[in-house]
Regions:
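Bacterial N-terminal signal peptides that target proteins for export
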Residues: 1-12
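C-terminal segment of classical bacterial N-terminal signal peptides
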Residues: 16-26
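N-terminal leader/targeting segments
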Residues: 27-33, 138
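Extracellular/periplasmic ligand-binding regions of membrane signal-transduction receptors
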Residues: 31-75, 112-118
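Short N-terminal helix-loop-first-beta-strand/juxtamembrane motif that initiates sensory/input modules
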Residues: 36-55, 83-105, 141-143
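Conserved beta-strands of PAS-like sensory domains
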Residues: 69-74, 150-175
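Extracytoplasmic/periplasmic sensor domains and loops in membrane signaling proteins
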Residues: 76-90, 108-148
């Protein structure tokens, strides 16, 4: 191998490593551009309100859950942020804030509808491949079944000021 080929190989390997480190951890697919854009919007809207924290409890969808706050804004049963992110996309994007409760993650604010269309799917618990990624402290991007329907999704761990995972940011659209 000549010097030029060697340098090109090293450069290509370096680009691959850098890309791998900078991209979010994913499930079976790379982040869909729509999902990535909406995830950035959801996280920015939350950050604009203030740091995330858990304080007290509040029932959501008939299930007791830790109360999630961004700054002074309580997120449980408050749909302003998720609705704004969903409307920003304008093409069926959904958004959710999950809160960690023991080993479960409970939807406390969402634009995801119940399967029967009778309201929002708050109080439901995350299950499936995204849960395993989050438990490992990693993001999950790809197709995931949500309440029986296929969605192209993104899930990212939500951390408090100490770095502890307190919930999950979710965005996705029905395929």
């Amino acid at each position: 191998m000549n010097r030029k080929s060697f340098l090109v190989s090293i450069l290509a390997a370096g680009c691959f490593v850098a890309t791998s480190l900078l991209m979010p951890s994913t499930g079976n697919a790379q982040a869909d551009p729509r999902v990535a854009k909406s995830m950035a919007s959801l996280k920015a809207a939350a950050a604009k309100l203030g740091a995330g924290k858990l304080d007290g409890k509040e029932a959501v969808g008939g299930k007791d859950a830790p109360a999630l706050y961004f700054g002074a804004a309580k997120i449980n049963n408050n749909f302003d942020v998720v609705d704004a992110v969903s409307k920003e996309d304008g093409k069926g994007m959904t958004a959710t804030f999950f809160v960690k409760s023991g080993d479960e993650y409970i939807r406390v604010s969402t634009s995801v509808p119940k399967p029967d269309g009778s309201g929002r799917a708050i109080g439901t618990v995350l299950a499936g491949p995204a849960l395993e990624s989050i438990k490992a402290g990693k993001a999950h991007y790809g197709e995931v079944p949500i309440l029986g329907n296929p969605y192209m999704t993104g899930y990212e761990p939500m951390k408090d000021g100490s770095g502890a995972v307190i919930g999950i940011y979710y965005v996705g659209y029905k395929k």
